Amino acid sequence: MYESLFGEKFSDAHDASFDVNATAKSFFKLAELGEYKNDDISKENIQYEEPKLRNSNFDKKIKKTEVSVEKNKNDIKSEFIHLHNHSQYSVLQATSSIEKIVSKSIEYKMNAVAITDLGNMFGVFKFNRIAQKNNIKPIIGCEFFVSEDRKKNKFTRDNPDKRFNQVLIAKNKDGYDNLSNLSSLAFTEGLYGQYPRIDKELIKKYKKNVIALSGNMFGVIPKLILNQGIEAAEEELKWWLDTFGEDFYLELNRHDIDEENHVNEVLLEFSKKYNIKIIAANDVFYIEKEDSTAHDILLCIKQGEFKSTPIGRGRGKRRGLKNDEYYFKSQNEMKNLFSDIPEAIN
């Protein structure tokens, strides 16, 4: 449609923010041509203002300072790498470009990095090419949407689709093939609205050479800890441990959120009780701390909401991240965050 209206292609096609720009520009052009009629607005008063997407004019926050690392950091012998990152291919949910993810890994002297986009693997080819070109080991994963029954697509308010997010990471080429199968089947058999879904039946079938993380607050175990209690979460944990064995890891995130701190305490108890390895993560949705405002506006676009609408659950609220800690942190920042749990990085 854009090419028909303007006689040219637009740059950065399939970059989420630029796609939104092209859609908005096309809408205003159609209104100007009289295709959309509104008695209250004359077409002479319709004016499209080009957004400054490359150099965002959002309010800048105070420049971040490097966190000083405490002496317990000396107990951390390994280098930290980010294993839970979302790129712009998590459509309208993350602002990190693949180029920036790789360049930040280089800047922070990380020799590997992962992408785990929400519900799809659209960015894998580009990520693999750019990472290898820059001598960074690409770790390929996906944060899948998991439903009780991927093929069920009729629900009611009393019996909704009960989904959770699940991070799966390929160990090797065979693992990548299994993730690809899961992603394809999510779209061909499990698509419900905007959610391509898999289920435990598929996970068991395609688990070979795949690593499973317990995930963020939308993972099934953290959700059960918060909503149903430790016993229910422990029963669920046993399924993942039985299914993945040593390839199942408990993911610890520290975004300075009370509920998350409680989840971490329970996960650490599970780790000791069942001898499950833990990993530190940061659930990255944008690159720099000051990018949090732009990211929040992107979430508003996805929901059709105003930024002034408060974040939360229920009527009159919108979805959003609770603070500005979901950025691509340096090794020093992550080692400082987990200086009391060095084994989460070692």
Segments from the language model and where they lie:
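Acidic, Mg2+-coordinating catalytic module of metal-dependent nucleases/exonucleases
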Residues: 1-52
